[in-house]
Amino acid sequence: VDLIVGFPEPYDAVTMKSPDGQTHLIFDLICWNKYGSMANFNEIIRNLLTHELTHFLIGYYYPEADAAVESPNYLTKLDAYTFHEGFAHLISFNATEIDNVDWHSSQLEKVYSSCKERMRAALAETDPEKEKQFLYDAICGKYYEKFACMCGMLYLANQWETKGMDGLKAAFSNYHGFAAKTLL
């Protein structure tokens, strides 16, 4: 765990590998200042820690999916982002156990619909400059607009609701094509 100051926006917490392959959980304490005046500061920090630990564990248990985040192939990277972020957001969502969340609230239904539109466009994109922007938007920006994060999370929530732990295990077994699976 590395506590630092000065990591580039928008990253307040990230999981990264050092040149020697060691995984680091990096938390920028200056970026955390924006959470200091919030009443639910403890929940936010717990969510950040849970989220980044999920990335760490994915890297440990599924190194191929972890390495794919650095792939030069656009669709492979989009699959890896959606996989990684889907699990991390599912497990850390609102500091709430996944079976205590109303995954079909009107807000989340609207979010899923909007993010699926963005995911469809991202999957169809072939222009390299637009692909770069889609990859950025997939995981950066306003919470509910990070389309890979939201599509992954809500797809996995559905797997949980319909198939339980077996559904999550099946989803975890293969990140290939994961972005497209979230549209089903």
Feature names for model-found ranges:
Residues C31-L49:
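Short pre-active-site segment immediately N-terminal to the catalytic Zn-binding motif
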Residues V1-I26, N42:
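Auxiliary, metal-adjacent structural segments of Zn-dependent hydrolase domains
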Residues G21-I30, N47, Y74:
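Extended, well-ordered protein cores
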Residues L48-Y60, G86:
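Catalytic glutamate of the conserved HExxH
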Residues W103-L184:
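Pan-zinc metallopeptidase signature
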Residues Y60-A122:
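Post-HExxH zinc-binding segment in Zn-dependent metallohydrolases
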Residues I44, L48, F83-L90, C151-Y155, ...:
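Extracytoplasmic/secreted proteins, especially bacterial periplasmic and envelope-associated proteins
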